[in-house]
Amino acid sequence: MRAWVVPMRFRVSWMLAGCCAAVVLAGCGSSSGPDVLTAPIQVVRTTDGTVGYRELGSGPPLLLIVGGGDSMDDWPPSFVDALAAHHKVVVFDNAGIGRTSAVSAPGSLSITAMARQTSALISALRLRHPAVLGWSMGGMIAQALAVTHPAQVSRLILAATAPGTGKAVPLPAYTFSVFSLSSKKQAASLFPKNQAAAAGAFLSAVGHYQSYYGPSAATIHSQKHAVLQWMAGHDAAGRLAGEIRVPTLVAGGTADHFIATANDRLLASSVPGAKLILFDDAGHAFWFQDAAKFIRVVETFIG
């Protein structure tokens, strides 16, 4: 395993006036191309309940799995649109959020159960071997998916997440208390303290969704249980990272307030052949601080 460290500083200019990352190099002002803000929320019945999702773009499929405490409306539109320029992108709500069915009784949710529902979504939408990008808790779900349903995944991008081998550096005690803070403070927690502009731009970006919503307090509590069980090594799928055979990219920020950089390294060393890339001076939402650069990394990796 070799780690690449990418110097990174936030560039707020590409977010101004609603410019999307897809046109950073070409210049702002283009109204053509995929637009997640106009993609309707759809509901599909799966073998594991209903799932609310959006899809846009065309090309090889790319499934985005959002983190804990988030809905699919926590993916900034510019980020999704940029990926959809070359892919059929699917974003969706995890179990118990929005129009997605719960998959367990309160307090007994597991990462593997959410991966099972994600697998059911892939089957219901007839996605052919999608690349899967999971952020934070979504990266844990992506790992479990690759372990339990390897034939469904072509490539794995694990962003700001942790292994489930039982060796992970624990989350800080304040992690789940963040969800009780104001939206402004929640956004700030995703970035280093010297990146206030990034936090403001993130909050502005997700504010473009007309009917923004998030999970209930009960769902967040269930997710907390699932994440802590995973990181402690109590979820069977998490202990099988060594069996992941799909090409895997692990990425993280060196200034992440939640997921220690040591976890990025541990995860990359646990998955055979995994590549590791670290973004310098970047927080939990490193993929947003310099979206254009991260998207180029993703596009190169997916091929």
Where are these regions (language model features)?
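Flexible "cap/lid" loop of the alpha/beta hydrolase fold
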Residues: 147, 156-184
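Conserved alpha/beta-hydrolase "acid-adjacent" motif
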Residues: 257-263
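Short glycine-enriched nucleophile-adjacent loop
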Residues: 139-150, 156
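Hydrophobic, aromatic-rich cap/lid helix
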Residues: 212-237
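Conserved HGGG/HGGXW glycine-rich cap/lid loop of the alpha/beta-hydrolase fold
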Residues: 49, 54-101
